[in-house]
Each structure stands twice: as structure tokens, then as C-alpha cells.
Regions:
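Conserved acidic
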Residues: 108
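A charged helix-plus-loop insertion that forms the helical arch/lid used to bind
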Residues: 94-105
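N-terminal, polar/charged subdomain of small-to-medium soluble alpha/beta proteins
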Residues: 1-95, 111-158
Length: 158
């Protein structure tokens, strides 16, 4: 399972001319997370990804005595906008056309993606999503910019 994690000031997802999820503009901002589910990923992979996403220390904070530090989405109650993105599993190492063979089929990927989202919500985070498998317009105002790639190998890829 792969995720592209971007710290944002605000973000939204539009499907069929309707906003289906958003992170409102705020001082804290939030995380826009694109998730690709690989063949071989399981609910255990999804739980590991949700743990990493919730505790990734990429927000600015300060200690009790005022020293700067990095804090997680859990620490600052930052909202997340989580989007399924099978194209993250694309292989471009051969030829000019990406291969999607590493991406899980939709029927396999959707419940694993949903497990990751539910695990984030179970940790107390506010999580909006797009519509699985739909064409989506994703808008964001990046903060920093700050973007990282998180890769949780399935047992098949470890």
C-alpha cells in the first residue's frame, strides 16, 4: 500500500459537480492523502498505514516551554481528506505506458481502502473521502509545500 501525503491549508473533492469531501481553510490545515492498494495488501496492511498516517509528525507545534517541535495529525486534531488512487501502483520501468498489474482489483481494493479510513476514524480523526472508483476533481492549497511518500509493503512485497 502506498500513500502520497500532502500537508494542506485546504482541500476539496468534487464528484459529479458536488463537493463530497473537504478540509476547510484553517491555521492547522490538514492532510490530503492519496492511497493506492496493491495486490497482496490486507486489512493488516491498512491498519499499519492508518497508524503511520495518524502518527506521522509533519505539523509544526511547540513544547510547553515554547521550543519548536513536530507533531502529528492526532496531536493537533488535523482533518484528513483520503482519496483512493490506483495509479500510485503504476509501474513505469518498461516502455512508455504504465502497467497497473501491481494494483489490486477494485473488488479487492475497496474493502482494504475502507478499513484504512475506518481505522483513522477510530483513532478520533475527522476523515472525508472521495467516491471509490469515480472520476474526481481534487483541489488543494499546499502548505509548505510538504509532501511525503509512505510505503507499507504487503507480505507479498516485503
Amino acid at each position: 500500500m502506498k500513500a502520497v501525503v500532502t500537508r494542506v491549508r485546504s482541500a476539496s473533492i468534487v464528484v459529479y459537480d458536488s463537493v463530497v469531501g473537504s478540509i476547510p481553510d484553517s491555521d492547522v490545515g490538514g492532510l490530503l492523502v492519496l492511497i493506492g492498494v496493491a495486490t497482496g495488501d490486507t486489512s493488516a496492511t491498512a491498519r499499519a498505514m492508518s497508524e503511520k498516517l495518524a502518527r506521522l509528525r509533519i505539523f509544526e507545534g511547540s513544547t510547553a516551554d515554547g521550543r519548536p517541535t513536530e507533531v502529528s495529525a492526532l496531536d493537533v486534531n488535523a482533518p484528513m481528506l483520503v482519496v483512493s488512487q490506483f495509479t500510485l501502483m503504476g509501474d513505469t520501468s518498461h516502455g512508455r505506458r504504465p502497467s497497473w498489474s501491481a494494483a489490486a482489483k477494485p473488488a479487492e481494493a475497496e474493502p482494504i481502502f475502507n478499513t484504512c479510513v475506518e481505522e483513522l476514524r477510530d483513532r478520533g480523526l475527522s476523515v472525508d473521502t472521495g467516491v471509490f472508483g469515480a472520476y474526481m476533481a481534487v483541489e488543494s492549497v499546499n502548505d509548505g509545500p510538504f509532501t511525503v511518500l509512505v510505503d507499507i509493503p504487503s507480505e507479498d512485497r516485503s
